[in-house]
Amino acid sequence: MRWCASRRYSPAFNPDRFAAHESFFVEDVRRWVRSRFGVTPTADRTAVCGVSASAEFALAMGLRHPDLYGAVFAASPGAGYQPPGMLPSPLPRTYLVAGTQEPFFLQNATRWADALRDAGANVVLTQRVGNHGDPFWAAEFPLMVAWAFGR
């Protein structure tokens, strides 16, 4: 079987490994931010972001912790973690993007956007000419931040 990055982050593949990543973000990273910067991030000013396989992780974190992450930025999400049949409430605001030159990932982003919208979430789905890579995602990141935080 071919290894893929989704196996590191997706609750669909390895719940124990996902739980370790989840604990790191929810506990360790938040503790570090408090100690390093002297702030306690609030959900309305905090987003969780990922690209490709880590976009699946960002979506899972947003669904599981809307009290911590008020926004999700998911660029070119993979298909290992798909929208559950019943989405929790409340849902974080979600910005999804995928390139027209990566149809597999565009389909996954659209699947998530549709499911989240149907559940009443505030969702942006953007498709742009582009492919699966850092320059495409880096160009979109400032737009995500401006949408979520008005900057």
Where in this protein do the model-derived segments appear?
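Non-catalytic cap/lid and distal C-terminal segments of serine-dependent acyl enzymes
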Residues: 1-151
